[in-house]
């Protein structure tokens, strides 16, 4: 099987982002965005998806974290799309309820080629430490749009905002792990009656 790796370098007046992913990795990561909480979340995304990720970001953090988070999501999504290629042989669909202490979050994905995010997650505070909670949605919107996936994220319940955010990243990681796996019964076919995913 061909290597499923993708690399994206994205430079704008706001950020400089370098992302390398290996879909068939072991969950190793090297992450530096300048935003501590975000680094922690991306480490969870890599570890639990088993997608190796090497992410280096320099952003306009003197303004806020928004551009850094959004542009990182864009680049990760593009790198995943590049690594998956025409998506032959993949499982395509996955869904999961993930528990962490008092919190339960559901994620479902269709690696469809049709980007869409359904987001039903509410935080009880605007920040986790210094990190804006609204940026969690911004990240997943950018990821879904640029990876070409349909992604649903639903928080059933939870009291701790850190746990709510973390279960979003871990649940998405786990469904990406399953949906990107090669299904040997597909025998290299594109998993769609249309013959393509778009």
Curated annotation (Swiss-Prot):
Record pathway: Amino-acid biosynthesis; L-histidine biosynthesis; L-histidine from 5-phospho-alpha-D-ribose 1-diphosphate: step 6/9
* Pfam families tied to this protein: IGPD
Q: Name one GO cellular component term.
A: cytoplasm
Please state where this protein is localized: Cytoplasm
This protein's record includes keyword RNA-binding: no
What EC number(s) has UniProt assigned to this enzyme? 4.2.1.19
Provide the reaction this enzyme catalyses: D-erythro-1-(imidazol-4-yl)glycerol 3-phosphate = 3-(imidazol-4-yl)-2-oxopropyl phosphate + H2O
The record, for InterPro entries, names:
IGPD_sf, ImidazoleglycerolP_deHydtase, ImidazoleglycerP_deHydtase_CS, Ribosomal_Su5_D2-typ_SF
Instruction: List the NCBIfam families hit by this protein, alphabetically.
Output: PRK00951.1-5 (NF002109), PRK00951.2-1 (NF002111), PRK00951.2-4 (NF002114)
Q: What is this protein called?
A: Imidazoleglycerol-phosphate dehydratase
Source organism per entry reads Agrobacterium fabrum (strain C58 / ATCC 33970) (Agrobacterium tumefaciens (strain C58))
Per the record, the gene is: hisB
